[in-house]
Amino acid sequence: MKKFNKVLSVVVASAMVMAMAGCGNTDNGSAATGTNAATESAAADNGAASGSVFKIGGIGPTTGGAAVYGLAVQHGAEIAVEEINAAGGINGYQVEFKFQDDEADAEKSVNAYNALKDWGAQVLDGSTTSGACIAVTDKTKEDNMFQITPSGSAVECVQYDNNFRVCFSNPNQGLASAQYIGENGLAEKIAVIYDSSDVYSSGIYEKFVKEAENQPFEVVAAEAFTADNKTDFSVQLQKAKDAGADMVFLPIYYQESALILTQAAAMGYAPKWFSCDGMDGILGGVDNFDVSLTEGVMLLTPFAADATDDLTQSFVTKYKEKYGETPNQFAADSYDAIYVIKAAIEKSGVTPDMSVSDICDGMKAAMTEITVDGLTGNGMTWTADGEANKAPKLSLIH
């Protein structure tokens, strides 16, 4: 069985502060409530004794083509909430968690946010994908609700002072990828295949190409596709092959990546492959895909499920026992997001009986003062503009 192997931590330019992120763009309350019923009822029972609970909402796609991301975010958060409640809660208060499906759609994500507000959410873990997250930031800003996205990587996902993220931002993924490839001499000629209609993909691409000008390799082909034309990549691959590219950089999601790897193999094209966190999920998320084609694929991602540290092993064991599968980076990001929320609440001293706005003000101030050791980084800190400081890592599929 193939797996990710964390081969080393990437040390980028010493002057660079890395901010880590993940993905790019209905209220399905009955499904979300059903999934979270045990978490909510247990917290409610325990919270009744203390008179109050912290209510954390989550948003992401649990149905549709991006469901692998939203379900991972939901499940990672649920494990963190269960651990926190079992350990006595946050400053003695239990936590309730409710997750809403948005199908990775901006309008539906806003609807999901409104449903969570009606439920009484005080803090938001989400949205999962960038396009949906950007839409929700406008609403959380209006309400002054604290929002931390585990995986929304677009720059605009942290455009307001109440917005924070756990993951890499798109530009910094592109920057770090170009630097790693160049500093380690992985390729001389690189082709890029990216989705010009997607904020995640195009954001990484733009920064990668700009940084490539400073690196000892040449971008010999930059081939785009769009959401309306993402099944046949023969033209893009042929141009990469004809240009002599010995590496193809794929700042895209795993569904399209699987098609590209399959079609490249069929035409006898075998370059090195380098990607980012959007490819996480390719080993188990694509039907009828020959996973042997991923052999040697390199990913810039903050989490490896086969890492040997105690925290990762504990999380992976719990996740497999509860959900029957290996967690991906999005699950780890969301797990960390809940613990970041916990740390900010503890540092600020806010309580559940305070208004959403007062809770947010306290947590915002605390975010630049906390340090969190998590699944996706040790000694993580945050800047006032919402970005996480932590070292990126490279994983190799073998």
Residues covered by each model-derived region:
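Hydrophobic helical h-region of N-terminal Sec-dependent signal peptides
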Residues: 12-17
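C-terminal motif of bacterial Sec signal peptides marking the signal peptidase cleavage site
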Residues: 18-22
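Extracytosolic ligand-binding ectodomains
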Residues: 2-3, 24-397
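Bacterial N-terminal signal peptides that target proteins for export
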Residues: 1-11
